[in-house]
Amino acid sequence: MTDLTEKNTALEEEKIESAVENQQKSIWKEIFAQGIWKNNPAVVQLLGLCPLLAVSSTATNALGLGLATMLVLTCTNTVISLFRQYIPKEIRIPIYVMIIATTVTAVQLLMNAYTYTLYQSLGIFIPLIVTNCIIIGRAEAFASKNSLLHSIWDGFSMGLGMALSLTILGALREIIGQGTIFEGIENLFGEQAKFLTHHIYHTDSSFLLFILPPGAFIGLGLLLAIKNRIDNVKK
């Protein structure tokens, strides 16, 4: 009788552990899904439109800014979550901005040192990451209220979602406007990355509509339409 009770207790404990483990896995998956698709900062929240539309003229520029944004998001979420209990609620926003500005400055200096051509190309949009609503929004809505690991994962997921949206829009505009993709990628990853550059079609003149700001709005509209269509089909 005692053995049977012990077995039942052990089985119950295993079930509880399994349920907790599954719940943890579902949390990680949900955070990732929110950043990549369900609550994508670019095509759902429509945040950070200024750099999204201005820098996405080529896939390389878009990818560079996307990676910088992802790095800043991950780092700021990490720091804010780590010190969330010590940050006074009354002055939390200025403190968040200081943390974000410090991180952006570090990223800017790194890009200036190692990817100077891309740094010149992105120009003012690197320091403008400080004012990006995505970063301050995730700091306030998630990092200040959740555990360190979940906050790191949220920052990475949201940053990756933004980087993917930027790169897809940049690739679309570059292909239609210039007939190339990842032109100048060696400025970001070095000479060994030149194999990523492809000439889709050869043209003597560029399709200026897609290179200029109107093309950014058209491309973003197409991305929004495709996402909404996929969501409607899933329903």
UniProtKB/Swiss-Prot annotation:
Keywords: Cell inner membrane, Cell membrane, Electron transport, Membrane, Translocase, Transmembrane, Transmembrane helix, Transport. Its EC number is 7.-.-.-. Its main location: membrane. Pfam families: Rnf-Nqr. InterPro entries: NqrDE/RnfAE (IPR003667), RnfE (IPR010968). GO terms for cellular component: plasma membrane. It is a multi-pass membrane protein. It is found in: Cell inner membrane. The chain crosses the membrane at residues 63-83, 93-113, 117-137, 152-172, 206-226. It is an enzyme of class 7 (translocase). It comes from the Bacteria. One of its GO terms (biological process) is electron transport chain. Belongs to the NqrDE/RnfAE family. NCBIfam families: PRK12405.1 (NF009070), rnfE (TIGR01948). The complex is composed of six subunits: RnfA, RnfB, RnfC, RnfD, RnfE and RnfG. Part of a membrane-bound complex that couples electron transfer with translocation of ions across the membrane. This is Ion-translocating oxidoreductase complex subunit E.
